[in-house]
Amino acid sequence: MSTEARAFGVYLHWPFCLSKCPYCDFNSHVAARVDQSAWLTAFEAEIDRIGALTEGRVLNTVFFGGGTPSLMEAATVQGILDRVRATWTLANDVEITLEANPGSVEAARFEGYARAGINRVSLGIQSLDPDDLRRLGRMHSVDEARAAIGIAQSVFQRVSIDLIYARQNQTLAAWRDELSRALDFGTWLLGEKNAQRLRFRERAIRSWSWQCFLATQREREEFLKAN
């Protein structure tokens, strides 16, 4: 078996958030206090367990998801990645990603993540419209989103942002404008999630017609190809 065929990725889940977004059906929980040393010990034990089953394999991706991984202390991320490096051979071009929410972005913490080995940050912007941010239950503002992107770009070469499309009352013109503004940030990658596939909790958010959703999706594809 070739080295490429034996390569694999590791996903590390940090399940804690400052609040629960209404569309989120991931394993995430609001906690006022988290014993990060205990969680580091648990991560290390799980890495050891999986490492014993994957001996000799090459690691080409590591992804910290959540939840809100940017609530982790840099020392916790450092400890996890130290155990990862001690357990597996890392590919020369290994991508080590950490998801972050704009409201929990701090330059000093990001610098600590970079020293630990993080080389890509994915920012959960979700929308550049204040009303939509409120409807989506997001805690950050558009200004905080812009600031977070700037901080991330000052530390990391690879920064991506997530946007949710086909949102309630969103027009094609508004989506085109939002895509244009997102690309103006100069991020390395733009990821999108469509609202039709997200489950909303506690309150109903009226969805678009199927025809309007498809038009939005086509607009996204055509716009990104042209830019």
PLM feature segments, named:
Residues 28-53, 57-226:
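Conserved non-cysteine loop/helix-boundary elements of the Radical SAM core domain that shape
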